[in-house]
């Protein structure tokens, strides 16, 4: 998908001049399976949006265990590891499959946000959606049983269980891989 189509259909920018300006700063990037978009602690140099493929956000806990924070699967999903675009990343973002992202150099993205309120509205909308998704996840993790969490995952991320390592799914759902395996067997 080319940048102009993305900013017309996926993340709509109504004003044609502004859309052309943002599209001209954007480039489609290919990530190999296993490649990192950003690592925890690094400052992002690009503002990226998922076009195709699967991304995983994760961090290491105090024991060095890999904890899956989020999955990116939908076209248009921002691949943003922190709310402040100029802050060090709080998570690493890794491609779990061959992946395409649309990227804008961070300096240009920040400049555009500083000078055009229309883009601030779009950014605020993306932040709201992200907050809603993270609060939904937090509610699911802390108010539902392991089986209910797994069923929520299957509904929210259809088909993803067959595309990613089950260890990542178990971590995301705050359960052991053994528990996830038992739940999968129970639903067969």
PLM features per residue range, with description:
Residues 144-188:
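Phosphate-/nucleic-acid-contacting segments
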Residues 34, 45-57, 74-75:
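Glycine- and acidic-residue-biased ligand/ion/polar-headgroup-sensing regions
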Residues 58, 80-81, 112, 153, ...:
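Residues that scaffold the ATP/ADP-binding catalytic core of kinase and kinase-like folds
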Residues 27, 36, 54-59, 100-101:
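Short beta-strand segments in beta-sandwich/barrel cores
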Residues 68-125:
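Cyclic-nucleotide recognition modules
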